[in-house]
Amino acid sequence: MVPEILFFTFLEGFILVLLDRYVTPISIKIKRDQFANNILCVPLALLLFTTALSACITLIDSHESRWMGVTRSSTLFQTVYISHNIVNTIIDLRENLPLKQKIPMLLHHLTSILAYGGGLTTGRMHFWACLDGLCEFTNLNLCVLLLCNTKEGDAGGAIKRTVGEFLLTLNGLLLWIGFFVFRMILFPLWLYWFFLDVKDMYGSPESESRPLVPGGERFSWIELVCYPVITMFLFVLSFLWFVQITKGALKQLGFLKEKTAAEGKKKDKKK
């Protein structure tokens, strides 16, 4: 497990160096790491989503497969995801921002590494890891938006002019839909399904005489309690991001006016 994680970590780091040197515009001086990372995240999100989806389809059938099943796709997904979070942790630590602003994302990276690392170590709960991992679909459109919003060196402006207004609006709409389906709906569904399975495994009369999951008695409190808590944390983070994305989508569609500097000064004077 560790050699594979190290391999993908160094591979991603190497690709980021190449993107920084040969693709990132020279005009970007400060946030070069972030720009290169946003480029790489588009194909990487597609890889993570497809491997997670493949594993979910294979492991969905029974209690035993959902809790004890392992596939090549589920292992690859978690390995690459851990590596990606290690790289993102380094990038976020290097970013010139107050530590207070970094804490939510650093917590996200740390909890993801620990949770998925636990799944790879025990060989259990791969389905639940991959079901959570379907949220990576949202990064396809999110990274495009972040690239377009790059203010340094007018890199974002150049991308916007190349892409065009229609595709930008379409990307924003798909981002909103993706966030709603793969985060706002997915995480509550994950929690509901998880607790139903736990109830069936430990709370039904049948479970006392015939365990639904052979070896299920070995599940630790970390797996049964901490994993749902991590998913709740992801849901709260996603909700906060969803509010911002909704406001951005409304502005893009013209339903919400963007505040000008003059309007902001007027409000300050009134206060």
Regions found by a protein language model. Give the residues of each.
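C-terminal transmembrane helix end/exit motif
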Residues: L147-T150
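Alpha-helical transmembrane segments and their membrane-interface exit regions
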Residues: L134-L145
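Membrane-helix and juxtamembrane interface regions of eukaryotic multi-pass membrane proteins
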Residues: M1-D132, E152-K271
